[in-house]
């Protein structure tokens, strides 16, 4: 993966996403032109087969940006924290 620019962001993985990626978090350079969660996902999934498997079914993945629930259209910028996790239910 060729990344352009020097903007770092922290990517967090929880539950089975962590198991697939092999990481609880990673710091990545935010590629130029990537300004939403949806635009970031292809850059994550090309890192390894595990990353691709973790984000293969986006209907089963939730996202938060800077600890606020979001979706694929949520804007991201340098130094943001993006978390991917399975749906959470209360009870």
Language model segments and positions:
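Ubiquitin-like/PB1-type beta-grasp interaction modules and other compact soluble beta-rich domains
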Residues: 1-90
């Amino acid at each position: 993966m060729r990344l352009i620019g020097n903007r770092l962001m922290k990517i967090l993985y929880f539950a089975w996403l962590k198991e697939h990626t092999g990481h609880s978090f990673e710091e990545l350079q935010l590629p130029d032109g990537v300004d939403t969660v949806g635009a970031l996902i292809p850059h994550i999934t090309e890192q390894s087969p595990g990353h691709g498997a973790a984000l293969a079914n986006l209907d089963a993945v939730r996202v938060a940006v800077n600890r606020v629930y979001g979706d694929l259209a949520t804007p991201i910028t340098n130094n943001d924290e993006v978390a991917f996790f399975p749906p959470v239910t209360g009870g």
